Amino acid sequence: MCEHNLLSSGYVAPLLNFHSPDSLYLQNLRGNGVHLSGLPQMSYSRREVCSLPWSSSNSCTAPAQSRAYSGYSQPFFSNSAAVSASLNTHKKGSLEESGRYYFQDVSHKSEEPGRPNAAYASEQSSASNGLSNLERRQLNAVAPNELSCIEQPESDASKQSVSSIAPFQPSLSAQNIRPAFTDGLPWCPSQVRSRKKRKPYTKPQLTELENEFMMNEFINRQKRKELSDRLELSDQQVKIWFQNRRMKKKRLMMREHTFTIY
């Protein structure tokens, strides 16, 4: 088997739509020189055919295939030697140009598929920088809030609970889990302070206050001060007790009044 040479005229000429010089004047002959039947005899030689002037009203343009390979149409020459020489040079030049353009295109597209372009890489870097700056600002905004929550003073009740929990080491784990649900977030204690435990009045104090209330429902500041010192109560406690007692009396009176109506 013979390999086709890419630069041979018999292989490239049909692709470029160029005819060999012999096809211009020997189209009615076979390859062995025998005349085909049914075709008129040629009464002139090869030299006369090549020397005849080419005059045609219609301009012969190369088809789209030849333009795709060469880019322009090849003019016809009167001399067969010039035609063959121009054909050979044109074949070589077109092949070199087409090969060069092909490899140039391949070199442009031979970049790695997983490698991003420069513009895309710059966009990604700018986007990542923007996200990092945003996260940094959020962290800076959250940090002072956490510090302010942590630095809040604890109430007296929490201190007492800590002091009472200290001797019992085995129950520390269970007691640490409970405040996590009641105080809110573990790193930020709840804003609501625990209410002080209500200190009940003793019986002697209640009897003394009741006697004073029977004598006078409203007391002045001086009398309230004397009661607080005598009963070992604060001025606020005495004041609140008298207010509550007056409201209680009022409710009882309203209830009796409603019963009498109905």
Curated annotation (Swiss-Prot):
A Gene Ontology term for the protein's cellular component: nucleus
Localization per record: Nucleus
Gene3D superfamilies, A to Z: Homeodomain-like
Keywords attached to this entry: Developmental protein, DNA-binding, Homeobox, Nucleus, Transcription, Transcription regulation
The keyword Transcription regulation is assigned to this record: yes
Region (Disordered): 107-130
UniProt xrefs under InterPro entries: HD, HD_metazoa, Homeobox_CS, Homeodomain-like_sf
This protein's record includes keyword Mitochondrion: no
GO molecular function, one term: sequence-specific double-stranded DNA binding
Ranges annotated as DNA-binding: 194-253
Protein task: Sequence-specific transcription factor which is part of a developmental regulatory system that provides cells with specific positional identities on the anterior-posterior axis.
Family, as annotated: Belongs to the Abd-B homeobox family.
Record-given protein name: Homeobox protein Hox-D12a
Gene name of the encoded protein: hoxd12a
